């Protein structure tokens, strides 16, 4: 039953399989929360979001107290700005490992994933901005015979 495709114009007419056409269902628990995990460098963020007033709690503290630098707060709020849902979700998260920059990136990744579980229609906008992709860059390991990962010990000819 395979259709023969002779040109790119014919490719548009071919219907996608039924499994790909199905609408994704939102994943929410009994309290109406969506859960996701985000990672960046050595940091791991566990994120729960639910409809609310825009309150963000990190490790039991307010966002402004945990991340004093405005740049890091901006990074965390980017998924809400892209999806036009600022002040519509309450976020509760726990972050472990890494430094503040890695933790902010992990939070952004986790919030983006949780938003797509809450409302699958947000996925294309978040994916276009690159928020759904786990950043693979990590610290390069130190090598023996060298001072650091790439820095060599000082060399003297004589």
From Swiss-Prot:
It comes from the Bacteria. The keyword Ribosomal protein applies. One of its GO terms (molecular function) is RNA binding. Residues 22-31 have a biased composition (Basic and acidic residues). One of its GO terms (biological process) is translation. Disulfide bonds: none annotated. Keywords: Ribonucleoprotein, Ribosomal protein. Residues 16-37 are annotated as: Disordered. The keyword Nucleus does not apply. GO terms for cellular component: cytosolic small ribosomal subunit. Pfam families: Ribosomal_S9 (PF00380). PROSITE patterns: RIBOSOMAL_S9 (PS00360). InterPro entries: Ribosomal_Su5_D2-typ_SF (IPR020568), Ribosomal_uS9 (IPR000754), Ribosomal_uS9_bac/plastid (IPR023035), Ribosomal_uS9_CS (IPR020574), Ribsml_uS5_D2-typ_fold_subgr (IPR014721). Belongs to the universal ribosomal protein uS9 family. PANTHER family: RIBOSOMAL PROTEIN S9 (PTHR21569), SMALL RIBOSOMAL SUBUNIT PROTEIN US9M (PTHR21569:SF1). HAMAP family: Ribosomal_uS9_B. This is Small ribosomal subunit protein uS9. The gene is rpsI.
């Amino acid at each position: 039953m395979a259709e023969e495709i002779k040109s790119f114009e014919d490719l548009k007419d071919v219907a996608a399989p039924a499994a790909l056409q199905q609408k994704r269902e939102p994943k929410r628990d009994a309290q109406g929360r969506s859960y996701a995990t985000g990672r960046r460098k050595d940091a791991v963020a566990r994120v729960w979001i639910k409809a609310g007033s825009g309150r963000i709690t990190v490790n039991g503290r307010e966002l402004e107290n945990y991340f004093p630098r405005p740049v890091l707060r901006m990074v965390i709020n980017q998924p809400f700005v892209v999806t036009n849902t600022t002040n519509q979700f309450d976020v509760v998260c726990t972050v472990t490992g890494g430094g503040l920059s890695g933790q902010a990136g992990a939070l952004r990744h986790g919030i983006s994933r949780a938003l797509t579980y809450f409302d699958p229609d947000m996925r294309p906008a978040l994916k276009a901005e690159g928020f759904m992709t786990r950043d693979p860059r990590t610290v390069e390991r130190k090598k023996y015979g060298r001072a650091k990962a790439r820095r060599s010990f000082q060399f003297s000819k004589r």
